[in-house]
Amino acid sequence: RKRIIQHTQTAGIAYDLLYTELTVYNRGGLRSFNDKEVHNVLERSGIKKKVFDTVNKANEWFITDLETVKRAIAAVKEGRSSLSSAEVTREYSPIAFRPEQQEAISKTKKQFKKGNQMLWNAKMRFGKTLSALQVVKDMEFQRTLILTHRPVVDAGWFEDFGKIFYDRKDFAYGSKNNGESYDSLERQAESHGMHYEDFASLQDLRGSASVGGNFDKNNEVFATDWDLIIVDEAHEGTQTELGKAVMGELVKEQTKVLRLSGTPFNLLDDFKEDEIYTWDYVMEQRAKVS
């Protein structure tokens, strides 16, 4: 309570104390945790802070509910760095996919039963992220790598992951900034059969010694037997010598690859007709009229 007073009094914040818990627990021996570890779990789970007073630093507050905080405490004790989407109290409901999105999902699932690659040639705002994640959910892929030339889109993938997997505790997301670390994801996959989506940037992987880079890193990522690799903005960076080297190391014999792009003109020659789903501006306008 003394700590709470320190962070509320100067900002004039009224509070209700709803729950207390000892910070000592047993996991192979006595351990303890602090509030910053719980805050880290909340932040990596996509839960936003509420800043009341930037001058007096009253910024250790989060917009969430008691049950989510209890789960965050439990996650710290279990050695996890985030909550699954199903553990965070949010008012999500199933996505109502448009007919063209349903067609892309259906065609991809059908293609992946007989082949290993698919290209979505779909214009901006098609909903490629949500639709691709629905493919992952429907096909129950255990290990999925999301690869992009634009690391900034991590937040968007993480948010959409929550919208698709809000009802599945057996799916987890991980990246440098959100969700779990790769090591934690793989550990949970091995021990509990967890399904996961790991987000990685092409720039980071290109610097790895495994593909001729200067740094001894990402060895585990390259060694993983990925079930699916989703390449976001696939026309960017994947056709260079280094980009091809990265894909060559990542893709194993049974790995499925789904490439997403609004302008895949440098990729089309590498795909057969039944390996491409197209939704362009003209098709969109026709759909609006009909």
Regions found by a protein language model. Give the residues of each.
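Conserved pre-motif I regulatory segment
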Residues: 86-121
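Non-catalytic accessory segments flanking enzymatic or RNA/DNA-binding domains
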Residues: 2-99
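Short basic/glycine-enriched coil/helix segment immediately N-terminal to the Walker B
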Residues: 112, 116, 191-194, 211-227, ...
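Conserved Walker A/P-loop ATP-binding site and its immediately adjacent core
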Residues: 129-165
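Inter-Walker segment of RecA-like/P-loop motor cores
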Residues: 166-213
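Interdomain hinge/linker at the junction between the two RecA-like core domains of SF2 helicases
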Residues: 273-290
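SF2 helicase catalytic motif II
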Residues: 202-204, 218-259, 263-265
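Walker A/P-loop
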Residues: 113-135
